[in-house]
């Protein structure tokens, strides 16, 4: 299902995206990387502090 969606949407728009939005995709990639780093660091700091009693699913 997902592959057919990519084929229907991505293939006709691929040259347009690669030319026009290349800089935007680089920015999006960097932003997602930064967000991922922050989230992983946040999880690590929470894990070091120990399980929070409010969550209770640990």
Swiss-Prot record:
Pfam families: Mit_proteolip. It is a single-pass membrane protein. InterPro entries: ATP5MJ. It comes from Mus musculus (Mouse). The keyword Membrane applies. The chain crosses the membrane at residues 22-39. It comes from the Eukaryota. GO terms for cellular component: fibrillar center; mitochondrial membrane; mitochondrion; proton-transporting ATP synthase complex. Keywords: Membrane, Mitochondrion, Transmembrane, Transmembrane helix. Disulfide bonds: none annotated. Component of the ATP synthase complex composed at least of ATP5F1A/subunit alpha, ATP5F1B/subunit beta, ATP5MC1/subunit c (homooctomer), MT-ATP6/subunit a, MT-ATP8/subunit 8, ATP5ME/subunit e, ATP5MF/subunit f, ATP5MG/subunit g, ATP5MK/subunit k, ATP5MJ/subunit j, ATP5F1C/subunit gamma, ATP5F1D/subunit delta, ATP5F1E/subunit epsilon, ATP5PF/subunit F6, ATP5PB/subunit b, ATP5PD/subunit d, ATP5PO/subunit OSCP. Its main location: mitochondrion. The keyword Transport does not apply. Subunit j, of the mitochondrial membrane ATP synthase complex (F(1)F(0) ATP synthase or Complex V) that produces ATP from ADP in the presence of a proton gradient across the membrane which is generated by electron transport complexes of the respiratory chain. ATP synthase complex consist of a soluble F(1) head domain - the catalytic core - and a membrane F(1) domain - the membrane proton channel. These two domains are linked by a central stalk rotating inside the F(1) region and a stationary peripheral stalk. Belongs to the small mitochondrial proteolipid family. It is found in: Mitochondrion membrane. This is ATP synthase F(0) complex subunit j, mitochondrial.
């Amino acid at each position: 299902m997902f592959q057919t969606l990519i084929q229907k949407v991505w293939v006709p728009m691929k040259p347009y995206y690669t030319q026009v939005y290349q800089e935007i995709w680089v920015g999006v990639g960097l932003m997602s990387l930064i967000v991922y780093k922050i989230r992983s660091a946040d999880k690590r700091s929470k894990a070091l502090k120990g399980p929070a009693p409010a969550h209770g699913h640990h």
